[in-house]
Amino acid sequence: MKVHIDEEADALYLRLDESKIIESEEVYPGIVLDFNEQNQLVGIEVLQLSSRINLTTKNIKVEISQS
């Protein structure tokens, strides 16, 4: 898993898998999900990031559960 924050673009990209992205879907304004050939989620893009979280925060806790 890779996380990239682009402050200039005001966006965050979370890459869950390195497989080829076949389809993207905006599921909520500014939230885009990327899917591979098996329709599995492989990436999450969050636009207008600074309006959603405080970018000056030094630590951000994220809980990830696998099903």
Task: Walk through the language-model features, giving the residues of each.
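Small, basic N-terminal interaction modules of short regulatory proteins
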Residues: 1-67
